[in-house]
Amino acid sequence: MNFLKAKSSYEKAAKVQNWMGDRLCEKIPANKFFDQVFEFGCAQGEFTRKLKKKIIFKKYILNDILDYKSQDKVEIFDMNDIAQYPLSTQKFDLIASNATLQWLNFKKILPTLANMLDTKGILLLSTFGEKNLEQITKSTGFSLKYLSLFEIKKILQEHFFEILIEEDFITLEFESPLEVFRHLKLSGVNSLGHHTLTKTFLKDYEKKFQNKLTYHPIFIYVKKV
């Protein structure tokens, strides 16, 4: 991933991620009060601003692995190591994250998140499924190891009973194959590895995929009982 270089262009390019943030906020009643909120993977705060407008809260703690020099105080650390930090001993009635989970070891961090969640607390997450950016995977061979809807549900069922999972598919269309990869670059996602964008490669992409790019968002709403 390459989010810092794309900092100035990310919010404009990451239309799907912004839409996912809107979908997550729809799961929460307007003006619902939360005593303690923890959001991880906050990046430049696009989802943070949406969620803060939707709810009422006493304390809101932010995390990200990178320092974007935000005006808000952000705890900088790798969420894969959350169990090693004092924050993991606190209790929250809302833990949220938008379009971050795919970068993490979900099975590893979920027990800690479950312990951090207070009784009747809500876990509100979005990620991407196994068909995310499938055109890129087929054309370059490069991909993250995305979990399927079934795999995510199975992991959640080890710790929770009230589980709601939804998935969607969004296909974006571009004017040229070069625009597809420019979109990915501007949104901070490096899906090419060391692959070179030759004219032959771009023509082949256009022929096979008609300059389309598919996202596979997954939405998770869990309540601790």
Predicted features by range, described:
Residues 124-149:
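Conserved class I S-adenosyl-L-methionine
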